[in-house]
Amino acid sequence: MATIYFSSPLMPHNKKVQAVAGKRSTLLGVAQENGVKIPFECQDGNCGSCLVKITHLDGERIKGMLLTDKERNVLKSVGKLPKSEEERAAVRDLPPTYRLACQTIVTDEDLLVEFTGEPGGA
């Protein structure tokens, strides 16, 4: 079970939700199930409108997570994938700070997910 805190300037306070790991749910899906309004358009990782900033709350216990070529290209195009994080993702499968909520699969890690409420803003 993962605890996910959603945070946005448009929300009066952070929303804490529990998510089942292994269900193959995306962050966007978990947000929608819990009334959190992360902006989105395509839900396929092409547009970048569901950009979020993720902070892992489990310290050093960050799990590997595949960054697809599609997501990598979108993050690079919006300037949210520094070279150091791109290399870390490619070599060690460690996730970058910014992700697309529609492409990020929920695991058993506790997360803080921040978004501005504007499409593509994080």
Swiss-Prot record:
Q: Name one GO molecular function term.
A: 2 iron, 2 sulfur cluster binding
Query: Which keywords fit this entry according to its UniProt record?
Result: 2Fe-2S, Chaperone, Cytoplasm, Iron, Iron-sulfur, Metal-binding, Nitrogen fixation
Q: What conditions trigger expression of this protein?
A: Expressed in nitrogen-fixing and non-nitrogen-fixing cells, although transcript levels are higher in nitrogen-fixing cells. Expressed during log and stationary phase growth (at protein level). The gene is monocistronic.
Keyword check for Endoplasmic reticulum: no
InterPro entries noted in UniProt: 2Fe-2S_ferredoxin-like_sf (IPR036010), 2Fe-2S_ferredoxin-type (IPR001041), 2Fe2S_fd_BS (IPR006058), Beta-grasp_dom_sf (IPR012675)
Name the reported effect of H56Q.
Considerably decreased protection of nitrogenase
Per its UniProt record, the required cofactor names are:
[2Fe-2S] cluster
Cofactor note, please?
A: Binds 1 [2Fe-2S] cluster per subunit.
Domain-related comment? Has mobile N-loop (residues 59-96) that changes position in a redox-dependent manner being folded against the protein in the closed reduced state, protecting its [2Fe-2S] cluster, or away from the protein in the open oxidized state. The open form complexes with the MoFe and Fe subunits of nitrogenase protecting them from O(2).
* Protein task: Binds to and protects nitrogenase from irreversible exposure to O(2), in what is known as 'conformational protection'. Shifts nitrogenase into an inactive, O(2)-tolerant state. Exists in 2 states, an open oxidized state that binds and protects nitrogenase, and a closed reduced state that probably does not bind nitrogenase; cooperative oxidation of the 2Fe-2S clusters causes the conformation change. Does not protect nitrogenase with the vanadium-iron subunit, not clear if it protects the iron-only nitrogenase.
| The protein's name | Protein FeSII
Q: Which gene encodes it?
A: fesII
